[in-house]
Regions:
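Extracytoplasmic ligand-binding site segments that recognize negatively charged/polar headgroups
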Residues: 2-142, 148-149
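Periplasmic-binding protein-like
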Residues: 33, 52, 131-135, 166-167, ...
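A ligand-binding cleft/hinge motif common to bilobed small-molecule-binding domains
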Residues: 12-14, 161-179
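Conserved C-terminal helix/tail region of periplasmic/extracytoplasmic solute-binding proteins
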Residues: 252-273
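Loop/turn elements at helix/coil->beta-strand transitions in domains of secreted/extracellular proteins
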Residues: 1-3, 82-86, 139-140, 157-160, ...
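Alpha-helical segments flanking ligand/cofactor-binding loops in enzyme cores
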Residues: 151-152, 211
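Mature extracytoplasmic/periplasmic domains
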Residues: 191-192, 196-256
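Hydrophobic residues within well-ordered alpha-helices
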Residues: 15, 153-155, 200
Length: 273
């Protein structure tokens, strides 16, 4: 049997529907915890414990005195001046690549309700402007197999700039898999962020110990330590003023319906061309 369980935000409705979770809104630390994430209210059944953010990983050694691209126009200039040095991964094999593709498609087209449960054909038609961007840059950018592949190529000097998860980058640096000189930033045009949540199983054999552990997990000191060691975004309201370099995500990942559609269209419109 399970005591404390970690979930993605997308898994929460299923767990709640199955009545598999116990209420945690009376934990001592609940007031300072984050319980609304990615437009989802956990309704007292879970708390966020791990925040993550996509952005760009880069190699300062290779970048030299070049300015980091902050706008899509600046990114285009960088790509034009440094062909094949910008890479992004297949969206079917890593969220960082999908995050970048979503931003291109969204900014080149019109805004829409990406959380909608059904896909509007008019929205998908507007994505053509985004696919045209990829077609125009086909010979100047590198498509990698996965997020890990992107960071390996960045580490080896093949790439200078690539979309990445911040916690993925920091985690690989901690294990020595990639060089500690590599850095991360979120460009001004925005990249989506998210996080994971923790809850207590309704049939937990150790409910008191589970509550003690979960309350410890959301404390400011614990969240700060997780951030320092693993690169996660702290999930505690007391720590929010300190997050100038990792802003609260204002850009959200697409919901399930549009994410699935985007990946299908990417294969047809970009990979098969």
């Amino acid at each position: 049997k399970i005591d404390v369980i970690a979930l993605s935000v997308a898994q929460l409705p299923v767990a709640m529907g199955a009545k598999a979770l116990a209420k945690v809104d009376d934990l001592p630390g609940y007031g300072d915890a984050i319980h609304q994430i990615q437009n989802v209210d956990t309704q007292g059944y879970a708390v966020a414990f791990w925040g993550n953010q996509t952005g760009f990983a880069y190699d300062p050694q290779q970048m030299g005195d070049r300015a980091l691209p902050q706008t899509l126009e600046q990114l285009q200039s960088f790509i034009d001046a440094n062909p094949k040095k910008f890479g992004y991964n297949d969206p079917n094999n890593g969220g960082a690549g999908e995050a970048f593709i979503q931003r291109i498609v969204t900014t080149q087209g019109d805004t829409f309700n990406s959380e909608a449960e059904s896909v509007d054909p008019a929205v998908v038609k507007n994505w053509q402007k985004g696919w045209q961007w990829f077609a125009a840059n086909k010979d100047k950018i590198t498509r990698t197999a996965s997020g890990a592949d992107s960071l390996t190529r960045l580490n080896d000097g093949e790439l200078m700039l690539t979309p990445s998860w911040e916690d993925h980058l920091v985690g690989l640096q901690k294990t020595g898999a990639i060089n500690s000189r590599l850095k991360f930033y979120v460009p001004e045009f925005g990249m989506p962020g998210g996080g994971n949540i923790a809850a207590i199983a309704a049939n937990s054999p150790h409910p008191a110990a589970s509550r003690l552990f979960l309350n410890w997990l959301i404390q400011p000191e614990t969240q700060h330590a997780l951030s320092k060691v693993f690169g996660s975004t702290p999930m505690n309201k007391q720590l929010r003023p300190d997050l100038n370099e990792i802003p609260e995500p204002t850009v959200k990942f697409y919901g399930k319906a549009y994410s699935t559609q985007l990946k299908k269209d990417f294969v047809r419109e970009v990979m098969m061309q």
